[in-house]
Regions:
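Conserved N-terminal alpha-helix of the aminotransferase class I/II PLP-enzyme fold
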Residues: 2-53, 71-79, 217, 228-229
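Active-site phosphate-binding strand-loop segment of PLP-dependent enzymes
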Residues: 95-163, 170-173, 186-188
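Conserved core segment of the aminotransferase class I/II
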Residues: 173-236, 259-260, 266
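PLP-dependent enzyme catalytic core of the Aspartate aminotransferase-like
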Residues: 1-10, 280-318
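Conserved PLP-anchoring active-site segment centered on the Schiff-base-forming lysine
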Residues: 58-106
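Short, conserved charged micro-motifs
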Residues: 190, 254-263, 296-306
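Glycine-centered flexible beta-alpha turn that most often forms the glycine-rich phosphate-binding loop
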Residues: 145, 269-272
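Conserved glycine-rich beta-strand-loop-beta hairpin in the small C-terminal domain of fold type I
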Residues: 225-229, 239-266, 273-274, 278-288
């Protein structure tokens, strides 16, 4: 049986000590903020109570349209933009991958923003540098949800967007069970959103856990990327096979039944790691997603990855 990703033992111990009053969680807040600023190369950062609250803060600061990808994003983008009564523009993508040139076809108002995830559907790295360059040249603010891309050793993700935000809930790369953050070089973002920030303040327990998890972010992301790459190399028809990702998506007309069978044969001790599509958060075509990002790092050994590959082959998903 596979193990679902949870906060590390050290993280849980620190959070427990903060909860019991053995150590002061408030002492960790500034340390967390400094680590986030260093990871994102951004001058200001705030810790929040959830990833969705980070999105709420970011979108609250935008006066123009909110541009969202047609798939491969996060459903909270649209839900929160609607709640804030923002005009939403849907951007055509290549199965989740953003081609900045497609924005030439859109009628976009001033002071608008594009919000997207570091990995399209978790399976394919976005060209964040090209996206940021296009948007900067056209007066569009970029908001990157780097929940799955924070700590990129190649410095391509979670660095160059105007606003970087993330969830730190399970089973994210920074995993403390809940919480999130938002970072930017534009101080006006935070001046405009003082009320949402007050309403989404995280607990001291989160500060303690996050401070510990931030120390392992780069290593944890790299382990996940390497495991995903290993599986992709052994399968012939994965989506965006040449891109880095933290899951593996395999298109198939009978995705629903195959996905069900895989769930029976690839069980975890908690939530699963098989997702079926169509699914806005992945791709809007029939497919099965193997959520490597959901697995505990101890499960990312070759023996376990070979078991996943074997079950995929047996299921005729290839």
């Amino acid at each position: 049986m596979f193990k679902f990703k949870t906060p590390s033992q050290k993280t849980r111990e620190i959070m427990s000590k903060v909860a019991s009053g053995e150590i002061n969680g408030a002492d960790f807040e500034e340390s967390c903020i400094e680590k986030i600023k260093k990871l994102t190369d951004h001058e200001e950062a705030k810790i929040t109570s959830s990833g969705n609250n980070s999105i709420f803060i970011a979108l609250s600061a935008i006066e123009g349209d909110i541009i969202i990808p047609d798939q491969g994003g996060w459903h909270g983008f649209k839900q929160i933009a609607k709640f804030l009564n923002k005009n939403i523009i849907t951007l055509k993508t290549d199965l989740g991958l953003i081609n900045p040139d497609y924005m030439d076809e859109l009628d976009i108002s001033e002071d608008s923003a594009l919000i997207y995830t570091s990995f399209a559907g978790y399976c394919a790295e976005q060209d964040a540098k090209a996206i940021s360059k296009y948007c900067r040249n056209n007066g569009i603010i970029t908001i990157e949800d780097a929940s799955a891309g924070i700590g990129d050793a190649e410095n391509r993700l979670g660095k160059c967007s105007d606003i970087i935000l993330a969830s730190t809930g399970s089973p994210k790369i920074i995993n403390v069970g809940s919480g999130g953050f938002i970072a930017s070089n534009d101080g006006e973002i935070f001046k405009k959103t003082t009320m949402p920030q007050k309403l989404s303040k995280a607990s001291e327990i989160i500060y303690g856990g996050m401070d510990c998890e931030l120390d392992n972010t780069k290593n944890n992301l790299q382990l996940t990327l390497d495991a995903t790459e290993y599986i992709k190399k052994h399968l012939s028809n994965t989506l965006h096979s040449d891109k880095r990702g933290v899951n593996v998506i395999i298109p198939h007309e009978d995705a629903k039944s195959i996905g069900w069978n895989l769930k029976q044969n690839l069980k975890t001790d908690k939530s699963g790691f098989i997702t079926t599509c169509p699914n806005y958060n992945r791709v809007k075509t029939k497919a099965v997603a193997i959520e490597i990002k959901n697995l505990d790092y101890s499960c990312l050994e070759k023996e376990n990855l070979d078991k996943i590959i074997e079950e995929i082959e047996i299921s005729n998903l290839q």
